[in-house]
Amino acid sequence: MALFHSCFFSDVLGMQSRAEVILPDRLEEGRPLPTLYLLHGLSDDETIWCRHTSLELYARGYYLAIVMPNAHRSFYLDSDDGSTRYFTYISEELPKLMESFFPLAKEREHRFVAGLSMGGYGAFKCALAKPERYAAAASFSGVLDFDHAYRNWEYLSTVISEETAATAPTNIIDAANKLAALSKLTPEIKIPKLYQECGTEDFLYESNIKFRDNALSNGLSLEYHERPGTHNWEFWNECIRKTLAWLPLQTESNKTTAIGV
């Protein structure tokens, strides 16, 4: 694998930004790379996935690019006053930039997003708010009950109002409800496939159960896993290995894995 440290200017953020990018050793001419956007948690940065997991080793088996952006402590939110627009940056500007820098596939069916904790929230928000852009999303120990998060993290009230926090797309349970309802009225809408995993001893476990039950009751395509574990890298290291196997990716043996296998 090749690891690129990229620095570039973001017009949306109005500042320099960074992303780590993993690419296969060999690129096939005329065959752009499927891409996984892998998001970090509240206290992390763009380097954390490579430093704390065996991501590069796991990725060696797949024809895939992995983009790990820095979103600081943004919660992947667009602020009410417009001063910061991290959701717009992650879901719209970043893919366009990466697709101009690297030979990445631009089709929805080849674009995926995943993340841990705050990043798990960001991943599901991207998929549920912009289903036309992502084929699949995965959340590991995600902050999936945004009402609860808003009540417990005072920082969030400095970025968005209580009204914004309670409704889609910020509130992803509300976003899931609206997308499910819309898909019943407009069957041609493609809903991303979702993968969710959380440790049974994680402080976010109850929030994850709430999202799971709501998503399944709405008929969303969600694969849910739980196992003993807390909010730590030992748990997430296994999550990312399993997620790479779950995504519909071309392997070194030239066999495409199927979502859900």
Go through each PLM region and give its residues.
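Non-catalytic cap/lid and distal C-terminal segments of serine-dependent acyl enzymes
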Residues: 1-261
